[in-house]
Protein backbone atom coordinates (compact mmCIF):
# COMPACT_ATOMS: atom_id res chain seq x y z
CA UNK A 1 0.00 0.00 0.00
CA UNK A 2 1.29 3.45 -0.92
CA UNK A 3 2.44 5.53 2.04
CA UNK A 4 1.09 9.07 1.76
CA UNK A 5 2.49 9.91 5.21
CA UNK A 6 4.08 8.20 8.17
CA UNK A 7 3.29 9.08 11.77
CA UNK A 8 3.41 6.87 14.84
CA UNK A 9 3.79 9.38 17.65
CA UNK A 10 0.49 8.71 19.49
CA UNK A 11 -1.01 5.69 21.22
CA UNK A 12 -3.86 5.36 18.73
CA UNK A 13 -1.66 5.09 15.64
CA UNK A 14 -3.08 2.66 13.08
CA UNK A 15 -2.55 -0.98 14.02
CA UNK A 16 -0.01 0.19 16.61
CA UNK A 17 2.38 0.46 13.66
CA UNK A 18 1.85 3.85 12.04
CA UNK A 19 -0.61 5.99 10.11
CA UNK A 20 0.19 5.98 6.38
CA UNK A 21 -2.91 7.39 4.62
CA UNK A 22 -4.51 9.67 7.20
CA UNK A 23 -3.99 10.12 10.91
CA UNK A 24 -6.32 8.23 13.23
CA UNK A 25 -6.45 11.60 14.99
CA UNK A 26 -8.08 13.07 11.86
CA UNK A 27 -5.02 14.85 10.50
CA UNK A 28 -4.77 14.67 6.70
CA UNK A 29 -1.57 13.41 5.09
CA UNK A 30 -0.54 16.78 3.64
CA UNK A 31 -0.66 18.44 7.07
CA UNK A 32 1.18 15.51 8.67
CA UNK A 33 3.94 15.75 6.06
CA UNK A 34 4.15 19.51 6.50
CA UNK A 35 4.73 18.94 10.22
CA UNK A 36 7.68 16.72 9.29
CA UNK A 37 9.09 19.63 7.27
CA UNK A 38 8.52 21.99 10.19
CA UNK A 39 10.41 19.71 12.59
CA UNK A 40 13.19 19.34 9.99
CA UNK A 41 13.53 23.12 9.86
CA UNK A 42 13.69 23.23 13.66
CA UNK A 43 16.52 20.71 13.54
CA UNK A 44 18.42 22.99 11.18
CA UNK A 45 17.84 26.01 13.40
CA UNK A 46 18.98 23.96 16.40
CA UNK A 47 22.21 22.94 14.66
CA UNK A 48 23.02 26.58 13.90
CA UNK A 49 22.08 27.70 17.40
CA UNK A 50 24.17 24.98 19.03
CA UNK A 51 27.15 25.88 16.85
CA UNK A 52 26.83 29.55 17.84
CA UNK A 53 26.47 28.71 21.52
CA UNK A 54 29.57 26.51 21.41
CA UNK A 55 31.47 29.33 19.73
CA UNK A 56 30.41 31.73 22.47
CA UNK A 57 28.63 34.06 20.07
CA UNK A 58 26.74 36.78 21.92
CA UNK A 59 23.34 37.07 20.30
CA UNK A 60 19.65 37.43 21.07
CA UNK A 61 18.64 33.77 21.09
CA UNK A 62 15.13 34.51 22.31
CA UNK A 63 13.49 34.55 18.87
CA UNK A 64 14.88 31.14 17.92
CA UNK A 65 14.17 29.64 21.35
CA UNK A 66 10.51 30.65 21.11
CA UNK A 67 10.19 29.46 17.52
CA UNK A 68 11.51 26.02 18.43
CA UNK A 69 9.33 25.57 21.52
CA UNK A 70 6.13 26.92 19.96
CA UNK A 71 6.53 24.97 16.72
CA UNK A 72 7.38 21.70 18.47
CA UNK A 73 4.22 22.24 20.52
CA UNK A 74 2.16 22.77 17.35
CA UNK A 75 3.12 19.28 16.15
CA UNK A 76 1.83 17.51 19.28
CA UNK A 77 -1.07 15.12 18.71
CA UNK A 78 -4.47 16.84 18.39
CA UNK A 79 -3.06 20.37 18.69
CA UNK A 80 -3.17 21.68 15.14
CA UNK A 81 -4.94 20.28 12.08
CA UNK A 82 -4.71 23.46 9.98
CA UNK A 83 -2.44 23.14 6.94
CA UNK A 84 -2.29 26.91 6.43
CA UNK A 85 -1.28 27.47 10.06
CA UNK A 86 1.55 24.95 9.83
CA UNK A 87 2.60 26.36 6.44
CA UNK A 88 3.00 29.80 8.03
CA UNK A 89 5.25 28.29 10.68
CA UNK A 90 7.29 26.54 7.99
CA UNK A 91 7.69 29.84 6.13
CA UNK A 92 8.78 31.64 9.31
CA UNK A 93 11.28 28.93 10.22
CA UNK A 94 12.82 28.96 6.73
CA UNK A 95 13.29 32.73 7.10
CA UNK A 96 14.67 32.41 10.63
CA UNK A 97 17.08 29.69 9.54
CA UNK A 98 18.39 31.87 6.72
CA UNK A 99 18.82 34.79 9.13
CA UNK A 100 20.72 32.66 11.65
CA UNK A 101 22.81 31.07 8.90
CA UNK A 102 23.97 34.50 7.72
CA UNK A 103 24.69 35.60 11.30
CA UNK A 104 26.78 32.50 11.95
CA UNK A 105 28.82 33.03 8.79
CA UNK A 106 29.50 36.68 9.67
CA UNK A 107 30.80 35.44 13.02
CA UNK A 108 33.21 33.11 11.27
CA UNK A 109 31.42 29.94 12.35
CA UNK A 110 31.81 26.97 10.05
CA UNK A 111 28.44 25.24 9.87
CA UNK A 112 28.03 21.56 8.98
CA UNK A 113 26.87 20.70 5.48
CA UNK A 114 23.66 19.13 6.72
CA UNK A 115 20.50 19.37 4.63
CA UNK A 116 18.52 20.48 7.68
CA UNK A 117 20.80 23.53 7.81
CA UNK A 118 20.96 24.33 4.11
CA UNK A 119 17.46 23.48 2.85
CA UNK A 120 15.31 26.43 1.78
CA UNK A 121 11.98 26.38 -0.02
CA UNK A 122 9.04 28.36 -1.34
CA UNK A 123 5.42 27.62 -0.35
CA UNK A 124 4.71 25.90 -3.66
CA UNK A 125 7.62 23.52 -2.91
CA UNK A 126 6.63 22.58 0.64
CA UNK A 127 4.67 19.44 -0.19
CA UNK A 128 7.50 18.06 -2.33
CA UNK A 129 10.19 18.90 0.19
CA UNK A 130 8.17 17.41 3.03
CA UNK A 131 8.17 13.99 1.40
CA UNK A 132 11.96 13.77 1.69
CA UNK A 133 12.35 14.64 5.38
CA UNK A 134 9.94 12.34 7.21
CA UNK A 135 10.56 9.88 10.00
CA UNK A 136 11.46 7.02 7.64
CA UNK A 137 14.41 9.06 6.35
CA UNK A 138 16.33 7.22 9.08
CA UNK A 139 16.54 3.63 7.81
CA UNK A 140 17.97 1.94 10.91
CA UNK A 141 14.92 0.90 12.95
CA UNK A 142 16.64 1.06 16.34
CA UNK A 143 18.38 4.37 15.70
CA UNK A 144 15.09 5.77 14.40
CA UNK A 145 13.32 4.57 17.52
CA UNK A 146 15.81 6.25 19.87
CA UNK A 147 15.78 9.47 17.86
CA UNK A 148 12.00 9.67 17.77
CA UNK A 149 11.73 8.80 21.46
CA UNK A 150 13.97 11.81 22.12
CA UNK A 151 12.03 14.07 19.74
CA UNK A 152 8.66 13.10 21.21
CA UNK A 153 10.05 13.78 24.66
CA UNK A 154 11.22 17.18 23.42
CA UNK A 155 7.73 17.92 22.09
CA UNK A 156 6.29 17.32 25.55
CA UNK A 157 9.07 19.36 27.12
CA UNK A 158 8.39 22.20 24.68
CA UNK A 159 4.71 22.27 25.64
CA UNK A 160 5.58 22.75 29.30
CA UNK A 161 8.29 25.31 28.53
CA UNK A 162 5.83 27.32 26.43
CA UNK A 163 3.29 27.41 29.28
CA UNK A 164 5.96 28.60 31.71
CA UNK A 165 7.17 31.20 29.21
CA UNK A 166 3.65 32.62 28.93
CA UNK A 167 3.87 33.37 32.65
CA UNK A 168 7.32 34.94 32.31
CA UNK A 169 9.39 31.96 33.45
CA UNK A 170 12.24 30.91 31.15
CA UNK A 171 15.21 28.62 31.75
CA UNK A 172 18.01 29.17 29.25
CA UNK A 173 19.56 25.81 30.17
CA UNK A 174 16.38 24.04 29.03
CA UNK A 175 16.36 25.98 25.75
CA UNK A 176 20.02 25.19 25.08
CA UNK A 177 19.50 21.49 25.84
CA UNK A 178 16.51 21.29 23.49
CA UNK A 179 18.62 22.71 20.69
CA UNK A 180 21.55 20.43 21.48
CA UNK A 181 19.30 17.36 21.55
CA UNK A 182 17.79 18.27 18.16
CA UNK A 183 21.33 18.84 16.89
CA UNK A 184 22.48 15.45 18.15
CA UNK A 185 19.61 13.42 16.68
CA UNK A 186 20.09 15.14 13.32
CA UNK A 187 23.86 15.05 12.85
CA UNK A 188 24.00 11.24 13.01
CA UNK A 189 27.20 11.12 15.05
CA UNK A 190 25.91 9.32 18.16
CA UNK A 191 26.06 5.59 18.76
CA UNK A 192 23.01 3.67 19.98
CA UNK A 193 24.44 3.79 23.51
CA UNK A 194 24.92 7.56 23.28
CA UNK A 195 21.39 8.00 21.91
CA UNK A 196 20.06 5.97 24.84
CA UNK A 197 21.90 8.29 27.20
CA UNK A 198 20.36 11.26 25.37
CA UNK A 199 16.89 9.77 25.93
CA UNK A 200 17.52 9.70 29.69
CA UNK A 201 19.04 13.19 29.63
CA UNK A 202 15.85 14.36 27.93
CA UNK A 203 13.99 12.87 30.89
CA UNK A 204 16.13 14.76 33.39
CA UNK A 205 15.35 18.00 31.56
CA UNK A 206 11.71 16.93 31.67
CA UNK A 207 11.97 17.08 35.45
CA UNK A 208 13.55 20.54 35.18
CA UNK A 209 10.84 21.90 32.89
CA UNK A 210 8.02 20.49 35.03
CA UNK A 211 9.64 22.09 38.08
CA UNK A 212 9.83 25.38 36.17
CA UNK A 213 6.16 25.20 35.20
CA UNK A 214 5.17 24.24 38.73
CA UNK A 215 7.03 27.30 40.00
CA UNK A 216 5.40 29.50 37.36
CA UNK A 217 1.89 28.27 38.11
CA UNK A 218 2.13 28.32 41.90
CA UNK A 219 3.93 31.65 42.21
CA UNK A 220 1.38 33.22 39.86
CA UNK A 221 -1.85 31.59 41.01
CA UNK A 222 -1.04 30.10 44.43
CA UNK A 223 -0.61 26.49 45.50
CA UNK A 224 -3.51 24.23 44.51
CA UNK A 225 -5.88 23.53 47.39
CA UNK A 226 -8.19 20.65 48.18
CA UNK A 227 -11.31 21.70 46.29
CA UNK A 228 -14.77 20.37 45.62
CA UNK A 229 -15.54 21.18 41.99
CA UNK A 230 -19.12 21.63 40.80
CA UNK A 231 -19.86 19.40 37.79
CA UNK A 232 -23.42 20.63 37.31
CA UNK A 233 -24.61 23.71 35.44
CA UNK A 234 -26.00 27.14 36.21
CA UNK A 235 -28.81 29.16 34.69
CA UNK A 236 -26.62 31.62 32.74
CA UNK A 237 -24.85 31.26 29.39
CA UNK A 238 -21.33 29.92 29.61
CA UNK A 239 -17.94 29.74 27.93
CA UNK A 240 -16.11 26.42 28.00
CA UNK A 241 -12.31 26.58 28.18
CA UNK A 242 -10.27 23.51 27.32
CA UNK A 243 -6.57 22.70 27.29
CA UNK A 244 -3.79 23.56 29.72
CA UNK A 245 -2.94 27.28 29.46
CA UNK A 246 -3.61 29.00 32.79
CA UNK A 247 -2.68 32.44 31.42
CA UNK A 248 -5.59 32.20 28.99
CA UNK A 249 -7.78 31.06 31.87
CA UNK A 250 -6.82 34.16 33.83
CA UNK A 251 -7.49 36.54 30.94
CA UNK A 252 -10.84 34.93 30.17
CA UNK A 253 -11.97 35.20 33.78
CA UNK A 254 -10.88 38.84 33.93
CA UNK A 255 -12.71 39.76 30.73
CA UNK A 256 -15.92 37.88 31.55
CA UNK A 257 -16.30 39.30 35.05
CA UNK A 258 -19.55 41.25 35.34
CA UNK A 259 -20.80 40.21 31.90
CA UNK A 260 -23.42 37.70 33.05
CA UNK A 261 -21.41 34.86 31.52
CA UNK A 262 -20.19 31.86 33.52
CA UNK A 263 -16.90 30.10 32.79
CA UNK A 264 -16.55 26.31 32.86
CA UNK A 265 -13.46 24.15 32.46
CA UNK A 266 -13.27 21.09 30.24
CA UNK A 267 -10.81 18.21 30.12
CA UNK A 268 -7.29 19.11 31.20
CA UNK A 269 -8.38 22.58 32.34
CA UNK A 270 -10.27 21.01 35.27
CA UNK A 271 -7.35 21.62 37.71
CA UNK A 272 -7.70 25.39 37.21
CA UNK A 273 -10.49 25.03 39.76
CA UNK A 274 -7.88 24.19 42.42
CA UNK A 275 -5.88 27.44 42.21
CA UNK A 276 -6.63 30.10 44.88
CA UNK A 277 -6.33 33.08 42.54
CA UNK A 278 -9.11 31.80 40.30
CA UNK A 279 -11.48 31.16 43.19
CA UNK A 280 -12.12 34.87 43.66
CA UNK A 281 -14.17 34.90 40.46
CA UNK A 282 -17.78 34.14 41.36
CA UNK A 283 -18.65 33.44 37.72
CA UNK A 284 -16.10 30.60 37.57
CA UNK A 285 -18.78 27.93 37.84
CA UNK A 286 -16.98 24.59 37.70
CA UNK A 287 -16.22 21.80 35.24
CA UNK A 288 -18.39 20.57 32.38
CA UNK A 289 -17.92 17.14 30.92
CA UNK A 290 -15.11 14.65 30.84
CA UNK A 291 -11.95 13.83 28.92
CA UNK A 292 -11.12 15.34 25.53
CA UNK A 293 -12.42 12.48 23.39
CA UNK A 294 -16.03 13.00 24.50
CA UNK A 295 -16.13 16.56 23.18
CA UNK A 296 -18.28 15.86 20.11
CA UNK A 297 -21.25 15.10 22.34
CA UNK A 298 -20.41 17.47 25.20
CA UNK A 299 -19.81 20.52 23.00
CA UNK A 300 -23.25 20.01 21.48
CA UNK A 301 -24.95 20.09 24.88
CA UNK A 302 -22.83 22.89 26.30
CA UNK A 303 -24.59 25.29 23.91
CA UNK A 304 -22.03 28.09 24.30
CA UNK A 305 -18.61 28.98 22.84
CA UNK A 306 -15.56 26.77 23.37
CA UNK A 307 -11.97 28.01 23.61
CA UNK A 308 -9.08 25.62 22.93
CA UNK A 309 -5.90 26.88 24.58
CA UNK A 310 -3.92 23.72 23.71
CA UNK A 311 -4.63 20.18 22.52
CA UNK A 312 -6.79 18.08 22.40
CA UNK A 313 -9.05 18.88 19.43
CA UNK A 314 -11.27 16.19 17.92
CA UNK A 315 -12.37 17.00 14.35
CA UNK A 316 -16.12 17.75 14.53
CA UNK A 317 -18.66 15.79 12.55
CA UNK A 318 -19.82 17.44 9.32
CA UNK A 319 -23.22 18.23 10.83
CA UNK A 320 -21.93 19.42 14.21
CA UNK A 321 -23.91 22.42 15.45
CA UNK A 322 -21.00 23.74 17.52
CA UNK A 323 -18.45 24.25 14.71
CA UNK A 324 -19.08 27.98 14.56
CA UNK A 325 -18.74 28.27 18.33
CA UNK A 326 -15.15 26.98 18.58
CA UNK A 327 -12.14 29.27 18.96
CA UNK A 328 -8.45 28.33 19.04
CA UNK A 329 -5.33 30.12 20.23
CA UNK A 330 -1.60 29.54 20.88
CA UNK A 331 -0.32 26.43 19.05
CA UNK A 332 -3.78 25.10 18.22
CA UNK A 333 -5.66 25.29 14.95
CA UNK A 334 -8.37 23.67 12.90
CA UNK A 335 -9.73 24.66 9.46
CA UNK A 336 -12.80 26.84 9.94
CA UNK A 337 -12.26 27.50 13.65
CA UNK A 338 -11.60 31.15 14.52
CA UNK A 339 -8.13 31.91 15.86
CA UNK A 340 -7.43 34.39 18.67
CA UNK A 341 -4.08 36.17 18.31
CA UNK A 342 -2.17 37.78 21.16
CA UNK A 343 -0.73 41.28 20.98
CA UNK A 344 2.94 42.15 21.43
CA UNK A 345 2.48 41.96 25.20
CA UNK A 346 0.85 38.54 25.16
CA UNK A 347 -2.63 39.91 25.84
CA UNK A 348 -5.70 38.55 24.06
CA UNK A 349 -9.05 40.07 23.31
CA UNK A 350 -11.83 37.57 24.01
CA UNK A 351 -14.65 40.05 23.30
CA UNK A 352 -15.87 38.09 20.26
CA UNK A 353 -16.24 34.94 22.35
CA UNK A 354 -18.04 36.86 25.10
CA UNK A 355 -20.42 38.52 22.63
CA UNK A 356 -21.26 35.13 21.13
CA UNK A 357 -21.83 33.61 24.57
CA UNK A 358 -24.46 36.25 25.32
CA UNK A 359 -26.53 34.97 22.39
CA UNK A 360 -26.37 31.32 23.50
CA UNK A 361 -28.53 29.20 25.77
CA UNK A 362 -27.17 28.03 29.15
CA UNK A 363 -25.46 24.63 29.20
CA UNK A 364 -27.62 21.52 29.27
CA UNK A 365 -27.01 19.50 32.41
CA UNK A 366 -25.32 16.14 31.75
CA UNK A 367 -24.41 15.36 35.37
CA UNK A 368 -24.55 16.96 38.81
CA UNK A 369 -22.71 16.95 42.09
CA UNK A 370 -19.05 17.57 42.85
CA UNK A 371 -15.66 15.95 42.46
CA UNK A 372 -12.61 16.59 44.63
CA UNK A 373 -9.06 17.49 43.60
CA UNK A 374 -6.16 19.77 44.39
CA UNK A 375 -3.71 17.25 45.83
CA UNK A 376 -0.51 18.71 44.41
CA UNK A 377 2.74 18.36 46.32
CA UNK A 378 2.32 21.39 48.60
CA UNK A 379 -1.10 20.20 49.75
CA UNK A 380 -0.11 16.55 50.21
CA UNK A 381 3.15 17.35 51.98
CA UNK A 382 1.23 19.53 54.43
CA UNK A 383 -0.33 16.28 55.67
CA UNK A 384 2.82 14.17 55.22
CA UNK A 385 2.76 13.05 58.86
CA UNK A 386 -0.77 11.74 58.42
CA UNK A 387 0.21 9.93 55.23
CA UNK A 388 3.32 8.35 56.76
CA UNK A 389 1.31 7.29 59.81
CA UNK A 390 -1.29 5.64 57.57
CA UNK A 391 1.47 3.76 55.74
CA UNK A 392 3.25 2.76 58.95
CA UNK A 393 0.05 1.50 60.55
CA UNK A 394 -0.86 -0.50 57.47
CA UNK A 395 -3.99 1.55 56.80
CA UNK A 396 -2.48 2.38 53.40
CA UNK A 397 -0.77 -0.62 51.81
CA UNK A 398 0.11 0.86 48.44
CA UNK A 399 -0.07 4.06 46.44
CA UNK A 400 -0.88 3.44 42.80
CA UNK A 401 0.25 6.13 40.35
CA UNK A 402 -2.30 6.17 37.52
CA UNK A 403 -1.30 9.42 35.85
CA UNK A 404 -1.40 10.03 32.14
CA UNK A 405 -3.83 10.43 29.29
CA UNK A 406 -7.25 9.17 28.35
CA UNK A 407 -8.23 8.12 24.85
CA UNK A 408 -10.93 6.65 22.66
CA UNK A 409 -9.96 2.98 22.53
CA UNK A 410 -12.48 0.69 24.17
CA UNK A 411 -9.65 -1.13 25.94
CA UNK A 412 -9.18 1.91 28.16
CA UNK A 413 -12.13 0.67 30.20
CA UNK A 414 -9.35 -1.36 31.80
CA UNK A 415 -8.37 1.68 33.88
CA UNK A 416 -11.87 2.11 35.30
CA UNK A 417 -12.06 -1.58 36.11
CA UNK A 418 -8.56 -1.56 37.60
CA UNK A 419 -9.44 1.37 39.88
CA UNK A 420 -12.63 -0.37 41.00
CA UNK A 421 -10.78 -3.63 41.68
CA UNK A 422 -8.02 -2.10 43.80
CA UNK A 423 -8.14 -3.21 47.45
CA UNK A 424 -9.65 -0.70 49.86
CA UNK A 425 -6.26 -0.10 51.52
CA UNK A 426 -4.78 1.44 48.36
CA UNK A 427 -4.73 5.07 47.22
CA UNK A 428 -4.61 6.27 43.61
CA UNK A 429 -2.26 9.16 42.80
CA UNK A 430 -3.23 10.76 39.51
CA UNK A 431 -2.73 13.69 37.17
CA UNK A 432 -3.65 14.34 33.56
CA UNK A 433 -6.88 13.38 31.86
CA UNK A 434 -6.47 9.69 32.72
CA UNK A 435 -8.30 10.66 35.91
CA UNK A 436 -11.62 10.87 34.10
CA UNK A 437 -11.71 7.07 33.97
CA UNK A 438 -12.14 6.89 37.76
CA UNK A 439 -12.40 10.32 39.42
CA UNK A 440 -16.19 10.09 39.65
CA UNK A 441 -16.21 6.63 41.21
CA UNK A 442 -17.22 6.43 44.85
CA UNK A 443 -14.04 4.83 46.18
CA UNK A 444 -14.23 6.31 49.67
CA UNK A 445 -11.31 7.38 51.85
CA UNK A 446 -8.76 6.03 54.31
CA UNK A 447 -8.74 7.92 57.59
CA UNK A 448 -9.96 11.03 55.82
CA UNK A 449 -7.52 10.67 52.91
CA UNK A 450 -9.51 10.26 49.65
CA UNK A 451 -8.60 7.14 47.70
CA UNK A 452 -8.18 9.20 44.53
CA UNK A 453 -5.73 12.08 44.95
CA UNK A 454 -5.73 14.29 41.85
CA UNK A 455 -2.59 16.43 41.60
CA UNK A 456 -3.75 18.29 38.49
CA UNK A 457 -2.76 18.48 34.83
CA UNK A 458 -0.34 16.08 33.10
CA UNK A 459 2.60 18.34 33.99
CA UNK A 460 1.60 18.00 37.64
CA UNK A 461 3.06 14.50 37.48
CA UNK A 462 5.97 16.53 38.84
CA UNK A 463 4.00 16.80 42.09
CA UNK A 464 3.81 13.04 42.33
CA UNK A 465 7.59 12.81 41.90
CA UNK A 466 8.10 15.44 44.62
CA UNK A 467 5.75 13.54 46.93
CA UNK A 468 7.58 10.27 46.27
CA UNK A 469 11.01 11.79 46.90
CA UNK A 470 9.79 13.43 50.12
CA UNK A 471 8.27 10.18 51.37
CA UNK A 472 11.56 8.43 50.56
CA UNK A 473 13.35 10.99 52.73
CA UNK A 474 10.84 10.91 55.59
CA UNK A 475 10.76 7.12 55.63
CA UNK A 476 14.56 6.90 55.59
CA UNK A 477 14.78 4.84 52.40
CA UNK A 478 17.81 4.73 50.10
CA UNK A 479 15.91 3.86 46.92
CA UNK A 480 12.75 5.40 45.47
CA UNK A 481 11.71 1.92 44.35
CA UNK A 482 11.48 0.73 47.97
CA UNK A 483 8.49 3.02 48.55
CA UNK A 484 5.03 1.43 48.68
CA UNK A 485 4.30 3.04 45.30
CA UNK A 486 3.54 1.25 42.03
CA UNK A 487 2.99 2.72 38.58
CA UNK A 488 0.24 1.88 36.10
CA UNK A 489 0.31 4.75 33.62
CA UNK A 490 -1.93 5.38 30.62
CA UNK A 491 -0.32 7.26 27.76
CA UNK A 492 -1.63 8.91 24.63
CA UNK A 493 0.59 11.70 23.34
CA UNK A 494 3.99 13.31 23.69
CA UNK A 495 3.51 15.03 27.03
CA UNK A 496 3.04 11.57 28.50
CA UNK A 497 6.33 10.60 26.84
CA UNK A 498 8.28 13.31 28.66
CA UNK A 499 6.59 12.35 31.94
CA UNK A 500 7.65 8.72 31.41
CA UNK A 501 11.22 9.75 30.56
CA UNK A 502 11.29 12.03 33.61
CA UNK A 503 10.33 9.12 35.87
CA UNK A 504 13.01 6.93 34.30
CA UNK A 505 15.61 9.66 34.83
CA UNK A 506 14.68 9.70 38.53
CA UNK A 507 15.40 5.99 38.73
CA UNK A 508 11.81 4.78 38.93
CA UNK A 509 11.48 1.18 37.76
CA UNK A 510 8.77 -1.34 36.96
CA UNK A 511 6.39 1.15 35.35
CA UNK A 512 3.45 -0.43 33.57
CA UNK A 513 2.45 1.49 30.43
CA UNK A 514 -0.75 1.02 28.48
CA UNK A 515 -3.11 0.38 26.91
CA UNK A 516 -0.35 -0.50 24.40
CA UNK A 517 3.38 0.08 24.36
CA UNK A 518 4.39 2.86 21.94
CA UNK A 519 4.68 1.88 18.28
CA UNK A 520 7.84 3.96 18.03
CA UNK A 521 9.69 1.56 20.34
CA UNK A 522 11.50 -0.92 18.13
CA UNK A 523 11.74 -4.47 19.53
CA UNK A 524 15.38 -3.89 20.51
CA UNK A 525 14.73 -0.52 22.17
CA UNK A 526 11.74 -1.97 24.00
CA UNK A 527 13.98 -4.81 25.17
CA UNK A 528 16.49 -2.32 26.61
CA UNK A 529 13.72 -0.51 28.52
CA UNK A 530 12.31 -3.79 29.79
CA UNK A 531 15.67 -5.18 30.90
CA UNK A 532 17.09 -1.99 32.42
CA UNK A 533 13.97 -0.35 33.81
CA UNK A 534 11.37 -3.09 34.12
CA UNK A 535 9.00 -1.31 31.73
CA UNK A 536 5.98 -3.51 31.07
CA UNK A 537 2.67 -3.37 29.28
CA UNK A 538 -0.67 -4.17 30.87
CA UNK A 539 -2.47 -7.49 31.09
CA UNK A 540 -5.87 -8.22 32.54
CA UNK A 541 -7.11 -6.34 35.57
CA UNK A 542 -6.84 -9.48 37.69
CA UNK A 543 -3.27 -10.23 36.57
CA UNK A 544 -2.09 -6.68 37.14
CA UNK A 545 -3.69 -6.42 40.57
CA UNK A 546 -1.79 -9.58 41.56
CA UNK A 547 1.47 -8.25 40.09
CA UNK A 548 1.31 -4.70 41.44
CA UNK A 549 -0.51 -5.11 44.75
CA UNK A 550 1.39 -8.08 46.16
From Swiss-Prot:
Keywords: 4Fe-4S, Cytoplasm, Iron, Iron-sulfur, Metal-binding, Oxidoreductase. InterPro entries: HCP/CODH, Hydroxylam_reduct, Prismane-like_a/b-sand, Prismane-like_sf, Prismane_a-bundle. [4Fe-4S] cluster binds at residues 7, 10, 19, 25. Catalyzes the reduction of hydroxylamine to form NH(3) and H(2)O. GO terms for biological process: response to hydrogen peroxide. Gene3D superfamilies: 1.20.1270.20, 3.40.50.2030. The modification Cysteine persulfide is found at residue 405. Its EC number is 1.7.99.1. Binds 1 [4Fe-4S] cluster. Binds 1 hybrid [4Fe-2O-2S] cluster. Signal peptide: none annotated. This is Hydroxylamine reductase. Belongs to the HCP family. It catalyses: A + NH4(+) + H2O = hydroxylamine + AH2 + H(+). It is found in: Cytoplasm. One of its GO terms (molecular function) is peroxidase activity. It holds the Pfam family Prismane. Hybrid [4Fe-2O-2S] cluster binds at residues 244, 268, 312, 405, 433, 458, 493, 495. One of its GO terms (cellular component) is cytoplasm. Its cofactor is [4Fe-4S] cluster; hybrid [4Fe-2O-2S] cluster.
Amino acid sequence: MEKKMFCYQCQETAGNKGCILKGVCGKDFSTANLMDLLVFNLKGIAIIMTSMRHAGVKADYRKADKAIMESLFATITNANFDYSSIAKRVEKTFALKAELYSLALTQGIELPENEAVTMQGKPEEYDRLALSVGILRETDEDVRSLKELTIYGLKGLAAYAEHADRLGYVDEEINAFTERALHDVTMGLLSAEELTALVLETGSFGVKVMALLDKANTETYGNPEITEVNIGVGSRPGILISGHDLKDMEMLLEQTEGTGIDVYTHGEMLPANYYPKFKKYNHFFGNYGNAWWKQREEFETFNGPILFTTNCIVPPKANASYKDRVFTTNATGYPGFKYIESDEHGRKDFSEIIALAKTCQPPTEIESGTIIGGFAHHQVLSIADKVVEAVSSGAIRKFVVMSGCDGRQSGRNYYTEFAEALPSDTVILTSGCAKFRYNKLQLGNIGGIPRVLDAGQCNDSYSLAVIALKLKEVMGLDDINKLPIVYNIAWYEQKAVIVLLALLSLGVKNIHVGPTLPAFLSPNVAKVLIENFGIAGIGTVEEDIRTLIA
